[in-house]
């Protein structure tokens, strides 16, 4: 088997794992914010803190340099995504939220790729049109239109995640950089929780859902995604994320 084929298979497997983790995030978040009493700000904080701890442990076990990685701009994008994501899922179903999120991701990343001079292939153009058409169809007034506030929050989260993904395409050590971004996002999450303290609410089920979302679906999932991003073009990275709403819808 050629090294090129092995490399492509590795990227495919990593991408599949990352997309499954992303869908798991939608399902866990919706489950926690719909079926438990945890509030969106607390969910966001627990998710980011548990993701930071999980990634720090993984980075420590892998050894290598112990210097700080990541940067504050990526951390801010990560926090804006996580916060908007949580507050949006208070009112949105998992599948609808995922479609809005990754439709916005698609438009953001492909738009940047075109601006940077990348050419759009046929399947990527089809994915772009599907995402754009899906967003328009969802947001048009009608019986099936999702709540406006939740939709706007999720679209904002999608743009933030698109920016975060774009900033990860040229990364070095994916795990260490993602860990650094999560650690830097903790103060932002803490400030949000303090601001929302009068509405804070925690329960054990919601707490554990947030930990699973942070440590497994977010921390580990994002580290895998950053690794996979090294082997795909910006426009392809955007298109493949359209699989997430399908996985989330099938999962519930």
What label would you give each PLM region?
Residues 1-45, 76, 80-84, 133, ...:
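Glycine-/small-residue-enriched transmembrane alpha-helix faces in small-molecule transporters
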Residues 67, 98-102, 115-137, 144-151, ...:
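Loop-to-transmembrane alpha-helix entry segments
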Residues 55, 78, 120-140, 156-158, ...:
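Hydrophobic transmembrane alpha-helices of multi-pass small-molecule transport proteins
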Residues 21, 62-102, 108-110, 130-137, ...:
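Specific transmembrane alpha-helical segments of multi-pass solute transporters/efflux pumps
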Residues 97-104, 168-187, 218-252:
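Helix-helix packing/entry segments at the starts of transmembrane helices
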Residues 23, 27, 49, 56, ...:
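Hydrophobic/small/kink-forming positions within alpha-helical transmembrane segments
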Residues 10-13, 41-57, 127-130, 149, ...:
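Hydrophobic alpha-helical transmembrane segments of multi-pass integral membrane proteins
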Residues 42-53, 78, 86-119, 157, ...:
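Specific alpha-helical transmembrane segments that line the substrate/conduction pathway
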